[in-house]
């Protein structure tokens, strides 16, 4: 398990440290990181060889677009799927990660 928590002052009430987890699943040779509800926490620097990552982008509960970009750059997954983004201008995440080598895939809700 990987910790999942808020670091921004005032938001720790949503996801306090030492309560929630994210997970790395390995199957068919792929390492998939599902972050859970979290922000760009320092523990993400320790993630290695992540093929696919799922990161939450939704205020006020999880990451801003800049936080999600920072988080992704910490461990450089091959593919990134943002989730929980609701009305967030999620296209800005693609722009923020342009040139990083991270393939940002956005699934539009229908």
Regions found by a protein language model. Name each.
Residues 55-58, 77:
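A broad detector of the eukaryotic-type serine/threonine protein kinase catalytic domain
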Residues 4, 55, 82:
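Redox-cofactor binding/interface segments in oxidoreductases and associated redox assembly factors
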Residues 37, 53, 80:
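Divalent metal-coordination and catalytic microenvironments
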Residues 48-54:
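Active-site metal-binding motif and surrounding structural segment of the metallo-beta-lactamase
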Residues 1-48, 107-110:
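Core dinuclear metal-dependent hydrolase active-site scaffold
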Residues 67-69, 73-110:
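Binuclear metal-ion centers of metallo-dependent hydrolases, dominated by the metallo-beta-lactamase
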Residues 7-9, 39-43, 60-65, 82-91:
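Active-site environment of divalent metal-dependent phosphoester hydrolases
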Residues 23-25, 32-34, 61, 85-88, ...:
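Broad hydrophobic/π-residue packing in well-ordered secondary structure
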């Amino acid at each position: 398990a990987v910790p999942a928590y808020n670091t921004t002052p005032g938001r720790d009430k949503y996801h306090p440290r030492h309560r929630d987890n994210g997970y790395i699943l390995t199957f068919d040779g792929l390492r998939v990181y599902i972050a859970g509800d979290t922000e760009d926490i320092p523990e993400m620097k320790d993630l290695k060889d992540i093929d696919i990552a799922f990161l939450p982008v939704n205020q006020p509960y999880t990451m801003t677009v800049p936080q999600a970009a920072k988080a992704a750059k910490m461990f450089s997954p091959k593919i990134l799927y943002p989730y929980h983004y609701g009305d967030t201008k999620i296209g800005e995440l693609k722009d923020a990660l342009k040139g990083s080598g991270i393939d940002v895939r956005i699934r539009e809700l229908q």
